[in-house]
A protein has these predicted regions:
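Extracytoplasmic/secreted envelope proteins and their assembly/folding machinery
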Residues: 28-31, 47-50, 54, 131, ...
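Acidic/histidine-rich catalytic neighborhood of metal-dependent amide-processing enzymes
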Residues: 119, 125-202
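Flexible glycine/proline-enriched surface loops and loop-helix/loop-strand junctions
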Residues: 196-198, 215-222
C-alpha cells in the first residue's frame, strides 16, 4: 500500500459550500487538545489521545475501534463507508511525540499556547497537526452527506517515534483488513526548515595506474590528482531563493 507524502486538498462536492473558517477553528481546537495530552515516547500513552478522538467521533455518531499491542499504546481506526466502486483511501497520522527538555522551551511544551500567531507545543507539527487535520477532513466528509466512491479510513497510530511494532507494523501484522487501502495520505512534504544541513567527512580509496608524481600523464594519473577531479555539487532550488510577501 503506497503512501503519498505531502499536502492534500479534498474538494467537497456537495450542495452546500463547506464553512472552511469554522473547520479551521475546530481543527485548531482538536490540535490544542491533542497537544495537551502528553504522549511522549517512551512511554507513549497514545491510548489517552486515541480515546479523545474516539469521543469526538462518537459525538458525531461515528464508530471507531482502538487496537493495542501493549497497554496504553493505542491505535484508533474509524471508517466512512462508500459505494465500493473504488478502493479505500487511508488518512493517517501518529499520536506519539519525541520527549522534551522543558528548560529549552520558551513556553510550556504541553500547553498548546497560541502566541503571535504560532501554536507552541510538542507534536504541534510532528504529528498531531496532521492528526487534527485528518480528523477534521473525516468529519467534514461525514457531515456533508455526500456519496463516497470509496471508503475513507482514519487511523491515528502509536509508536511512530521508534516503536513501529506497536503502531503501523502491528496494524499491518494483526489488523490489516481494517486499514487496507489503495493509498494513504500521511505526514511529510517540502516544508522549509532550519538546521537540516550537516557537514559530512568522507574517506575514499582511489585505484589508479602507478606513475611518478613528478611527471603524471594526466591530472587523474595519481590518486591525489584523481581526487582533485571530484566535482562539488550544489542542489538547484525549484523555488526563488528569497521569499517576498506574507503568508497566511
Amino acid at each position: 500500500m503506497p503512501t503519498r507524502r505531502g499536502s492534500c486538498v479534498l474538494h467537497l462536492l456537495s450542495s452546500q459550500e463547506p464553512d472552511f473558517l469554522s473547520a479551521h477553528q475546530e481543527a485548531l481546537r482538536f490540535l490544542q487538545d491533542l497537544v495537551r495530552i502528553d504522549t511522549s515516547s517512551p512511554p507513549g500513552n497514545e491510548t489517552e489521545a486515541a480515546r479523545y478522538i474516539q469521543g469526538v467521533l462518537a459525538y458525531e455518531g461515528i464508530e471507531s475501534q482502538i487496537y493495542e499491542r501493549e497497554p496504553g499504546r493505542g491505535n484508533l481506526v474509524a471508517r466512512l463507508e462508500g459505494n465500493g466502486s473504488k478502493r479505500p483511501i487511508l488518512l493517517m497520522g501518529h499520536l506519539d511525540v519525541v520527549g522534551v527538555e522543558p528548560d529549552a522551551w520558551t513556553e510550556e511544551p504541553f500547553g498548546a499556547v497560541i502566541k503571535d500567531g504560532y501554536l507552541y507545543g510538542r507534536g504541534s507539527q510532528d504529528d498531531k497537526g496532521m492528526v487534527a487535520v485528518a480528523l477534521e477532513v473525516f468529519l467534514m466528509l461525514h457531515r456533508s452527506g455526500m456519496e463516497l466512491d470509496r471508503d475513507v479510513i482514519l487511523m491515528a497510530e502509536a509508536g511512530e517515534e521508534g516503536s513501529p511494532q506497536l503502531g503501523v507494523q502491528y496494524m499491518i501484522d494483526e489488523h490489516f483488513p481494517e486499514i487496507d487501502a489503495e493509498f494513504a495520505l500521511n505526514e511529510g512534504g517540502s516544508i522549509i526548515q532550519q538546521n537540516d544541513r550537516w557537514v559530512v567527512s568522507v574517506a575514499t580509496t582511489e585505484k589508479v595506474s602507478r606513475r611518478c608524481a613528478s611527471s603524471p600523464t594526466a591530472p587523474q594519473a595519481t590518486g591525489r590528482g584523481h581526487c582533485r577531479t571530484i566535482p562539488s555539487y550544489t542542489w538547484p532550488l525549484p523555488w526563488p531563493s528569497s521569499v517576498v510577501g506574507n503568508t497566511p
